[in-house]
């Protein structure tokens, strides 16, 4: 018998009590001082202004904020403390994060606090991340088939298992071991990707390739996109035509889009369908605060207004351009990013004027062959480290959901 089995048998032989989260914790919605620009400050005594863009990909903790607000702004916002939980009520819907800093949250967040007499922080994190709770939040927040913003009442109504602290601690120990293994593999993969970036930059060195420096504008035809009316169901329901938005551009090669539109949208909303083999970049999104997203699209697609898409001209390999834009991406982002504005964006005219090395087509193809093979090793979920990480993650999710499922203890009323 495992230690967990022993603890369950000893401490809760008749099952585990379930309680509504609102009965054992404080759940509140964030608040935004408006207009927010008035309260943003660079002063050292400013209060952390926590946004979704401050969250590292895959992170459990929020450790810093890019912006601060004045104390006056903080009085009009929701103050949260180190150790509290926050949940996104829109982007990264329902995803829990543990605060490692004090600060303020806007109305796109919910906070959970005053739970430590009942829950270990790490146990509550695993519990809120579990498939059952995530599905329950999505179900409760859905109305008429459209996902609504997650609100405090929905989160308060979540019914959660409350085992003894000793049981929570053992579950955390087991799941921490799973996540530690995954983290080690992920770190090794990150090191390989760093190595890949180094070799990519060496291969794309203009001197090594005897390449000409060519303005991005001269690589082919650049175009933008738009969004068909969301109010027209016929533009979206059962759509089969890919529609690229910034949330799709996360991998070097796009496998599919989250949203799809219909032929009616193409015809009536004058959407342009771009050919397979196009290259897309994001020019307007919060992700531009730290990343320049580029992707190669191996299928016909449409795009929204935050995307610019390139159809390369004869003599230019679109795969080569994709690799080159990724290699020079940080420099492009830094030199073309607009200052100010409510949403991060690039000055596209400056992007078009940026120069990248373009060698003869046969050299482009040789470079692509080398980089495609290296990229496959780094990102293909069917081989090597990516496959092992994927398998570990599935194993972790399986045991997490299994360990967090308890027989419910129901108090019997005596006659």
Predicted regions and their residues:
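Amphipathic alpha-helical segments
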Residues: 1, 15-19, 124, 156-193, ...
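Accessory (non-catalytic) regions of SAM-dependent nucleic-acid methyltransferases
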Residues: 1-11, 402, 414-415
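Non-catalytic DNA-recognition/assembly elements of restriction-modification systems
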Residues: 8-32, 202, 206-227, 388, ...
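Short, solvent-exposed loop/turn positions at domain surfaces
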Residues: 10, 73-74, 144, 230, ...
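Sequence-specific dsDNA recognition surfaces
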Residues: 24-37, 53-82, 218-232, 247-276
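A short beta-sheet element
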Residues: 51-52, 64-129, 245, 262, ...
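Long compositionally biased, domain-poor regions of proteins
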Residues: 85-88, 136-139, 161-164, 289-290, ...
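A short glycine-rich beta-alpha junction/loop motif
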Residues: 89, 104-110, 143-163, 301-308, ...
């Amino acid at each position: 018998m495992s230690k967990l089995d022993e603890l369950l048998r000893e401490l809760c032989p008749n099952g585990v009590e379930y309680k509504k989260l609102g009965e054992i914790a404080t759940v509140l919605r964030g608040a935004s001082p408006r207009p927010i620009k008035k309260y943003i400050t660079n002063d050292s005594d400013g209060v952390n202004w926590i946004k979704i863009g401050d969250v590292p990909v895959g992170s459990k903790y929020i450790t810093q904020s890019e912006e601060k607000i004045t104390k006056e702004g903080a009085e009009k916002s929701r103050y949260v403390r180190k150790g509290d939980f926050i949940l996104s009520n829109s982007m990264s819907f329902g995803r829990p994060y543990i605060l490692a800093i004090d600060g303020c949250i806007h109305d796109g967040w919910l906070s959970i606090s005053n739970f430590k007499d009942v829950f270990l922080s790490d146990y509550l994190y695993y519990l809120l991340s579990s498939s059952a709770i995530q599905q329950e939040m999505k179900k409760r927040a859905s109305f008429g088939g459209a996902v609504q913003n997650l609100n405090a009442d929905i989160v308060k109504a979540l019914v959660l298992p409350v085992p003894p602290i000793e049981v929570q601690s053992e579950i955390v120990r087991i799941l921490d071991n799973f996540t530690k293994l995954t983290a080690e593999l992920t770190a090794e993969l990150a090191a390989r990707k760093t190595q890949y970036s180094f070799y990519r930059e060496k291969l794309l060195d203009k001197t090594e390739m005897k390449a000409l420096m060519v303005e991005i504008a001269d690589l082919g035809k650049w175009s933008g996109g738009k969004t068909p009316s969301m109010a027209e169901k016929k533009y979206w329901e059962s759509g089969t035509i890919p529609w690229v938005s910034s949330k799709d551009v996360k991998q070097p090669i796009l496998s599919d889009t989250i949203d799809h539109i219909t032929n009616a949208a193409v015809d009536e909303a004058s959407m342009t369908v771009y050919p397979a083999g196009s290259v897309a970049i994001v020019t307007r999104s919060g992700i531009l605060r730290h990343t320049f997203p580029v992707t190669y699209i191996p299928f016909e697609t449409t795009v929204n207004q935050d995307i610019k898409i390139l159809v390369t001209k004869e003599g230019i390999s679109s795969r080569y351009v994709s690799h080159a834009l990724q290699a020079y991406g940080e420099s492009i982002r830094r030199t073309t990013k607009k200052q100010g504005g409510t949403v991060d964006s690039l000055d596209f005219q400056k992007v078009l004027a940026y120069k990248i090395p373009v060698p003869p087509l046969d050299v482009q193809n040789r470079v692509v062959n080398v980089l495609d093979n290296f990229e496959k090793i780094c990102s293909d979920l069917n081989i090597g480290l990516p496959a092992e990480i994927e398998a570990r993650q599935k194993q972790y999710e399986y045991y997490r959901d299994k360990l967090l499922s308890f027989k419910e203890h129901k108090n019997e009323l005596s006659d």
